[in-house]
Amino acid sequence: MSKNININVNYLTRVEGHGNIVVEVKDGKLEICRLEIVESPRFFEAFLRGRSIYEAPHITSRICGICACGHTLASIQAAEDALGIKPTEQTTLLRKLLLHYEELDSHILHIYLLVAPDLVGVPSFVPLIKSHPDVVRRALRMKRLCNELCDILVGRHV
């Protein structure tokens, strides 16, 4: 039996975004094990050229529908760094809380929209409405709670 193995998964499914996995084993030794992120460029930097610094957080929040808060906060931090502004401890803590909300929200979407269909043997989330309505209700309830938390933290969910 050969001790050489090459694995190339050129399109990962059930993930947020696009990625590949590359694994190479030579003479029984792992040589390469790599996750490749293959997102297409979206050129948001070009959208920001010539715009007011105040527009950047709003524009960058549209980079991703899953992690809008992270992109918004990165934009705000870049502006603060450029202007030499140091946020207060309270602001920093609120931002961390917002990122924790977003992580929870992302996990809910991942588990219920991307993983649950595979666990019950259906091709997507939609068939779960009939086959597992309790799972769908739980997913919607958790998503609604996350949206309400975001409303409390920043005035609206993104």
Cite the ranges covered by each PLM segment.
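Catalytic cofactor-binding cores of redox enzymes
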Residues: 2-158
